[in-house]
C-alpha cells in the first residue's frame, strides 16, 4: 500500500545567495562560503544537538523548494553533459524529482547559542537563502567515505576552474570576510554549461551585492559590483 508522508522543516539556512544562479553546483566546492542554520522554535532545544560538536562534517537533508512541479519526467538533461543528453532522473542530482529532496555534506564550523536557540555555522553549502532543512545527520567517515566508488558521468570534476580578475576598487565594496568566497564562487564558473558567449554579461546576487561579469576562455572578469536594490 502506498503511503504519504508529511514533513515539517526543522530549520532554514541563511546564506549569501538570494537566487539559484551563482550557487555552487555541489556542496564542498567553495569551502570559503559560510552560512547559518537557524532552527524553528519547536526544534531549538540545545539537547537535540548534544554531541554534534564532535563531528567535523554534517549532512543536510533539504527541499528544492524553488523547483517544485506538479509533474515529473523520468529523464532529465544534466547541465554537466551540456544539456543535450538525457539521463534517468535517479542517476542525477536534478532538482526536478518526484520528491524534491536534496542532500548536502557541509563542514560544521561551529555551534553558538543565541536568545533564539542554537545556530549552526557551516561551510561549503550549496543552498539558496531561506531553503528549508528537513533533517541534519552527522557525517561518519568509516561509513560515508567510499574510496572505491564509481561516479558515472560525473566521475571527475566538471573542469578547470576559471582565473578570476576583480578590479580592486570593485572588490573593496565587498566585506573582507566575503571576498575569498566570492572569488571561489566565480572560479567555479556560475554560467549554464551551454552558454559560452564571451560578449555576454552575466549577473547574480551575492551577500547583498549585484555582481556582473564576463567570461572569455578560462578568464572571468568582473565588470561591476554594486549594492543590491
Residue spans for each PLM region:
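Mixed-charge, low-complexity intrinsically disordered regions
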Residues: 1-101, 113-121, 125-229
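Conserved positions in beta-strands of structured domains
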Residues: 106-109
Amino acid at each position: 500500500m502506498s503511503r504519504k508522508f508529511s514533513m515539517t522543516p526543522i530549520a532554514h539556512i541563511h546564506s549569501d545567495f538570494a537566487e539559484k544562479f551563482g550557487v555552487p553546483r555541489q556542496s564542498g566546492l567553495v569551502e570559503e562560503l559560510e552560512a547559518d542554520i537557524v532552527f524553528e522554535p519547536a526544534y531549538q532545544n540545545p539537547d537535540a544537538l548534544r554531541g554534534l560538536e564532535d563531528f567535523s562534517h554534517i549532512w543536510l537533508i533539504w527541499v528544492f523548494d524553488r523547483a517544485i512541479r506538479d509533474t515529473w519526467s523520468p529523464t532529465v538533461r544534466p547541465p554537466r553533459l551540456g544539456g543535450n543528453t538525457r539521463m534517468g532522473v535517479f542517476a542525477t542530482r536534478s532538482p526536478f524529482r518526484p520528491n524534491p529532496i536534496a542532500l548536502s555534506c557541509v563542514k560544521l564550523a561551529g555551534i553558538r547559542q543565541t536568545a533564539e536557540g542554537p545556530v549552526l555555522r557551516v561551510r561549503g553549502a550549496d543552498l539558496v537563502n531561506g531553503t528549508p532543512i528537513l533533517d541534519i545527520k552527522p557525517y561518519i567517515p568509516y561509513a560515508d567515505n567510499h574510496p572505491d566508488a564509481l561516479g558515472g558521468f560525473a566521475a571527475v570534476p566538471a573542469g578547470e576552474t576559471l582565473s578570476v580578475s576583480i578590479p580592486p576598487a570593485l572588490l573593496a565594496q565587498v566585506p573582507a570576510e566575503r571576498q575569498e568566497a566570492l572569488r571561489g564562487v566565480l572560479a567555479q564558473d556560475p554560467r549554464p554549461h551551454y552558454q559560452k558567449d564571451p560578449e555576454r554579461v552575466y549577473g547574480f546576487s551575492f551577500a547583498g551585492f549585484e555582481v556582473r561579469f564576463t567570461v572569455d576562455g578560462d578568464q572571468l572578469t568582473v565588470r561591476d559590483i554594486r549594492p543590491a536594490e
